[in-house]
Every structure is written in structure tokens, then in C-alpha cells.
């Protein structure tokens, strides 16, 4: 067993040989930032000040060779070879909210488009799930694999969990959900997970950018804000290939109609002039850049494909956004 000291906070925890640094930190109740937990998003990146680690497989875009040479590590993939002293951010807002393993029952299935289904999971009657708006769950499958999905409802909605599932061609789990898994099926989950959640203590206006089912955590955040009368200005940008891919568009339109602090800007990238679309066209991050010449006064949440998240971060920071005000959740597809 190896010992880890977080230098900037003084917190310590032990790591068993079978664990990554992140797994051990979560078990110890120490909240490091993280997203995908499989080396794809880079949210858990920090610095090794002393000691050595071995990395599991990860994507080069999440940790470059130059960063690795400079002593950076992805804590979701890093396994200590000796005692460590590390430097990383910690998240105070989720202190006291530890992930738990729970049984859930499929309560309701509703297909919203060719490849998106809403899944309502019912919790046991004696259980309540405490979470932050925007966090995610993981299904624990019988073969040992895990599948992660963002929570789409707000924390005040008790007793159930809403998920938005995109069907992935050849994807074992999502094809089961769409084609084989009936209502009343019992599954196991671990929840809540992730450091992508609404920072309620900030008072800056918010830009939210959602691609595809990246809308799920954004929906939870906005409904949480409405319920708690958090009236900060919100600019909601949704990106999709075609207008038909903007599921729950009517809900977003209602938010913008009845909530004066919410503006809704849907953007499609692959439509043509004969598709009856009279809204914005192009790339969703580019629409943000066109509308906001100076991003220095904003807080930004981006959720969707890793490529979209990466280019959004690069260009938004270049346009004045403080890097610490950029929060993201990159949706990566698990191996089939």
C-alpha cells in the first residue's frame, strides 16, 4: 500500500495495489475533479511532485507527452509505484456526498428520436440519492464492465433518476436498453459521480454548451436553478447535426419563453436550405464566439463529444475566459 499527500491541502490517503489514485481518493472521501474515469477527458489531471506512477492506457489528447515529461499525471489512470506527493485541485462542494452502490428498477422508457431514449430509474423506497445537479451514474454490469450516463433530473426530484441514452451502433449495453431490456428490469448503479456540476456560489452569467445527449446534465442544472430561483443569466447553446436531433427542443423553448434570464440558441451543422430550419447554422462553439466577443466575465459549462469540448476550451480561453471558469464533461464511448 502506498501513501499519497496532497500538498496544497494537506489531505492524505492510502492507495491499495489494485487502485488508481482517483479510486483511492474517492474511497477516502477526498473529492478530486474527474469526469470519464477512463483516461479520455483530462479532468483529473494533476502534478506529481515526488514519487513515481505507472499509467494505464489513456488518450494522448488528455495527457500529452510534454505534460507527462513535466510531471503531470491522469489520476484516473495513475497507479503509484511508491509514496506520492501530488498537487491538484479539490472540490469542497461535494464534501460529504460519497458514491454508493444501489439497486434500481427501470420504471419508464420513452424513445424521443431514432437514437435517443429517456430512461427513468426507480430507487428503492427506503433510499434517497443525494447529488449535485450535473453529476452522473455508472451502471455496474454483470461482466464487470461499467457504463456511465449523466443524471438529467434535478436533485429536488426524489425517488427516481432520469437518463438520456444514445443508441450506439454495436454498443452492447445501449442496444440492450433499446431492444431487449424491459420495464421493471433490476440493475445496479454507483452514484453520484463526477465533478461536472453547477457552481452555485458564483454570481457570473452562465454559458452552457450541449452537444447531443450532453443536454442531459445541462437540463438537470437548469431545472435546479429554476426550482431554487437562481436567476443568473443563462445562455443555452445546443449543437446538433440536424433539427430532428434537438430532442426536448420544446422544453428549451418554454424555458426561454417563461424565464426571462434564460436565452436558448440551437445550432445545427449538417442541415440544408430545404430543411425548413430558420435558426443558426454552423458549429455550436463558433456561435458562442460570434455572440460573445469577451468571455472574461462568464462561467462556462460544456458537455458533449471530446472534440467539441476540446475546441471549445481552447477558443473560449483565447477569447478571454478564465480557465478556472471552464467546466466540462466529455462523453466518451466505452468499448463494445
Positions of PLM-derived features:
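Short, surface-exposed secondary-structure boundary micro-motifs
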Residues: 49-52, 89-91, 142, 192
Amino acid at each position: 500500500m502506498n501513501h499519497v499527500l496532497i500538498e496544497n491541502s494537506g489531505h492524505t490517503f492510502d492507495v491499495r495495489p489494485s487502485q488508481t489514485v482517483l479510486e483511492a481518493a474517492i474511497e477516502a472521501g477526498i473529492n478530486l475533479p474527474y469526469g470519464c474515469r477512463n483516461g479520455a477527458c483530462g479532468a483529473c489531471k494533476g502534478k506529481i511532485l515526488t514519487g513515481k506512477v505507472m499509467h494505464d492506457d489513456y488518450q494522448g489528447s488528455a495527457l500529452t507527452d510534454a505534460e507527462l515529461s513535466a510531471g503531470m499525471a491522469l489520476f484516473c489512470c495513475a497507479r503509484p509505484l511508491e509514496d506520492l506527493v501530488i498537487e491538484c485541485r479539490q472540490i469542497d462542494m461535494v464534501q460529504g456526498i460519497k458514491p454508493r452502490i444501489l439497486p434500481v428498477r427501470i420504471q419508464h422508457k420513452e424513445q424521443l428520436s431514432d437514437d435517443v431514449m429517456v430512461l427513468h430509474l426507480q430507487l428503492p423506497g427506503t433510499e434517497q440519492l443525494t447529488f449535485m445537479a450535473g453529476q452522473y451514474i455508472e451502471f455496474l454490469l454483470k461482466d464487470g464492465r461499467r457504463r456511465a450516463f449523466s443524471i438529467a433530473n434535478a436533485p429536488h426530484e426524489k425517488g427516481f433518476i432520469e437518463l438520456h441514452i444514445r443508441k450506439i451502433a454495436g454498443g452492447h449495453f445501449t442496444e440492450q436498453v433499446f431492444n431487449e431490456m424491459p420495464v421493471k428490469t433490476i440493475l445496479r448503479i454507483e452514484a453520484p459521480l463526477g465533478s461536472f456540476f453547477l457552481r452555485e456560489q458564483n454570481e457570473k452569467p452562465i454559458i452552457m454548451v450541449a452537444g447531443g445527449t450532453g443536454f442531459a446534465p445541462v437540463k438537470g442544472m437548469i431545472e435546479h436553478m429554476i426550482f431554487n430561483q437562481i436567476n443568473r443569466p443563462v445562455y443555452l447553446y445546443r449543437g446538433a447535426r440536424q433539427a430532428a436531433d434537438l430532442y426536448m427542443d420544446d422544453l428549451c423553448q418554454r424555458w426561454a419563453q417563461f424565464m426571462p434570464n434564460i436565452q436558448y440558441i440551437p445550432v445545427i451543422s449538417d442541415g440544408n436550405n430545404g430543411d425548413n430550419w430558420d435558426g443558426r447554422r454552423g458549429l455550436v462553439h463558433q456561435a458562442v464566439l460570434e455572440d460573445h466577443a469577451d468571455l472574461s466575465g462568464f462561467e462556462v459549462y460544456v458537455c458533449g463529444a471530446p472534440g467539441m469540448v476540446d475546441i471549445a476550451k481552447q477558443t473560449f480561453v483565447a477569447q478571454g475566459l478564465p480557465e478556472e471558469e471552464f467546466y466540462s464533461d466529455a462523453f466518451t464511448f466505452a468499448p463494445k
